[in-house]
Amino acid sequence: MENTTNRNTAGVLTSSNGNFATNSVAASTPKRSKSARRKTFKCTGYDGCTMSFTRAEHLARHIRKHTGEKPFQCPACLKFFSRVDNLKQHRESVHAHKNHHSTSSHQRKPSSSSLSSSSSASSSSSASSSTSYSDPYRKTNINSGNMPMMAENEKAPQIIHSSPEFITSTRSIPPISPRSIYNTQRQQQHQQQQHQQAPYYFPSHPITDSYYQYPLPSNNNTINYLPSVDVQYPLNVSPSSTSHPASEVIISSFPPRSMPSTSFKYKDSADFQARTTMNKYNIRPSNINVNTSNINNHLDSFSPPFSPSTTVAEAKPIILPQYQQAFSQPPNGNKNNNMSSSKNGGKGGENFKNTDDRNDNNNKKRSETLSESDISVNTNKKRLSVDYILT
């Protein structure tokens, strides 16, 4: 024990032994301590400070105390420190302790008593809500005697006023999620695209009503209000032939304001040739006589107003059934006019004269005898009631 406590005395007591020299040397030359080390780094420049350090980083750390510099910052609380060890100690003592308590509180499971209290509270709240929604005019009353019996952490229940029926009905509807709204919008857009992309087939030719039903004419003396009629005959077929089927009658615009333009399907047809010859010889309606005798003989057809000669057979276009009534009723003055026209004409079956002088004389006589009830042909080309094209 004495050897360990006091080396000097131990060396003296053991001097009789042979090991005296070694013990005395060990006692005289002890190990070099930190304080006994050589301190080469001294603090200079600051009055009253005479400290010295063995390492340069220790001197720099000491100088920060004089300057007040704190380069080390805590990332959690943004607090600055002058030494790294102080920052490390701060984080371990302050922030690590807080994190440990927060994680332990999250991991702690609720006790059975808390679960029972929460279930009872939820059942009471559901019962109160059901009673409040069942009767719209009922209110829950709270007894003042039961107030002290409640726990301190529980809040006093509020008086629940019942809402009107229309509000309760809207509350019972489940909330609409954004996904359901998105799905409904997608369905609506898809339906709209299907409606827009529905195939629409255009007809190969425009739909036209070639047999437009005009109103039937009244028992008026004039016949100028009738629609114009275009007669079309087949290719290279005589209109007087009985073997061929009846020709088509196409009703054009009502009423014509000017000379109607005739369209021909084939240039070599009979009606096209007749029109070209009429245009070539400049035949006017004033130079053509109207045969009114055939109207009385054949009530279901008209005689053609334009005929190049008496030898050519007359064309008898077929009138549609809805127009037969209008053409079957002759005007009032047809008989007198026919008699006068037959007297002026000389012979009953003769319609035209071969010479221009006879045509002029006949026109002068017939212009006085024809009345308004006959089929009138306007010479000024403003209005033409019925147009017949003959070969």
Curated annotation (Swiss-Prot):
It comes from the Eukaryota. Residues 1-27 have a biased composition (Polar residues). The modification Phosphoserine is found at S162, S163. Pfam families: zf-C2H2 (PF00096). GO terms for biological process: cellular response to salt stress; regulation of transcription by RNA polymerase II. Residues 110-134, 332-344 have a biased composition (Low complexity). Induction: Repressed by glucose but is activated in the presence of non-fermentable carbon sources or salt stress. The latter transcriptional activation of NSF1 is partially dependent on the SNF1 signaling pathway. The keyword Cell inner membrane does not apply. Residues 1-37, 91-149, 326-374 are annotated as: Disordered. Transcription factor that participates in the transcriptional activation of glucose-repressed genes during exponential growth in non-fermentable carbon conditions. Also involved in salt-stress response. This is Nutrient and stress factor 1. It comes from Saccharomyces cerevisiae (strain ATCC 204508 / S288c) (Baker's yeast). The lineage of its organism: Eukaryota, Fungi, Dikarya, Ascomycota, Saccharomycotina.
